[in-house]
Curated annotation (Swiss-Prot):
Domain notes from UniProt: Aquaporins contain two tandem repeats each containing three membrane-spanning domains and a pore-forming loop with the signature motif Asn-Pro-Ala (NPA).
PANTHER family reported in the protein's UniProt record: AQUAPORIN-8
One Gene Ontology molecular-function label: identical protein binding
Family: Belongs to the MIP/aquaporin (TC 1.A.8) family.
Alphabetically ordered keywords of this record: Membrane, Repeat, Transmembrane, Transmembrane helix, Transport, Vacuole
Organism: Toxoplasma gondii (strain ATCC 50611 / Me49)
The name this protein goes by in its record: Aquaglyceroporin
Length: 263
């Protein structure tokens, strides 16, 4: 999620300061260094997704897990963003990475694919760790009793939209800000979304789904799977459109497909 992205998470943002030193390197060493930097970013995304899903299991394993899990997830995400925002940009979420791909031309398609792959693999490994903690596979967040899938979709779309919109405004709309502003804002949005019954992260749902398949648990709510898997992407799309509609002209950013000159 973070500075969400945007310095370390983009293709060139985390490397601008080292251009002079890199000019003196041989091409082979320069490429190797570039590879190492990218692998560090991907590993941060993998590790963070793993820890987030594990935090879900740790929260649910406690008595009163329905109340403990949101707090466990929120505190974990706050810490991870603080630790990794200057390395990978702290996306931790495929929906976030897709939004950054739309808003930062330095974040390439290769970056997007590698980030999403790392997040999905991390979520899957975390789900198997959750299996070890719980003694059974984690369940995909079920639909609320008596609520249709289309209504439950709002529980995913709205919190995700608010979270990503807030981060876009903070990161692209302001200059200097307190270092912990983004972790606090993202943590607050995640906490509110978790209590509202939202997953907000397709990597979590994907990992739990794979762990259920591998443990031969066929009792999967397909409607809940689709809502929690694709709802965050819809929320990310609305967040992107909302930011373009309200801020992109007055606080111009180098969008991939649009160019706002600003006032």
């Amino acid at each position: 999620m973070d500075q969400f992205v945007f310095s370390g998470g983009s293709e060139g943002g985390g490397e601008l300061g080292g251009d002079r030193e890199r000019d003196s390197l041989t091409p082979e060493l320069g490429r190797f260094e570039h590879l190492i930097f990218n692998m560090q970013k991907y590993f941060c995304e993998f590790f963070a997704a793993l820890v987030i899903v594990s935090a879900v299991a740790f929260g649910l394993a406690k008595e009163g897990g329905a109340q403990a899990a949101p707090l466990s997830i929120t505190s974990t995400i706050f810490a991870l963003i603080t630790l990794f925002k200057d390395i990978s940009g702290a996306h931790f979420n495929p929906a976030v990475s897709c939004t950054i791909y739309m808003t930062d031309p330095r974040f390439t398609l290769v970056d997007l694919l590698c980030y999403v792959a790392a997040q999905l693999i991390g979520g899957t490994v975390g789900a198997f760790i959750g299996y070890g903690i719980m003694g059974k596979a984690l369940d995909i967040l079920p639909l609320d009793p008596g609520m249709s899938a289309s209504r439950q979709l709002f529980h995913e779309v709205i919190p995700t939209m608010v979270m990503i919109y807030a981060v876009l405004v903070l990161v692209f709309g302001y200059g200097v800000m307190w270092e912990l502003t983004v972790p606090f804002v993202v943590g607050a949005c995640v906490l509110a979304g978790a209590f509202a019954g939202a997953t907000m992260n397709p990597a979590v749902t994907f990992g739990i789904f794979i762990s259920n398949i591998c443990t031969k648990n066929t009792n999967i709510d397909v409607a809940a799977l689709l809502v929690t898997l694709f709802g965050p992407f819809l929320g990310a799309m609305f967040a992107f459109l909302g930011y373009v509609g309200t801020h992109a002209y007055h606080n111009p950013v180098p969008l991939r497909f649009l160019n706002f000159r600003g006032l």
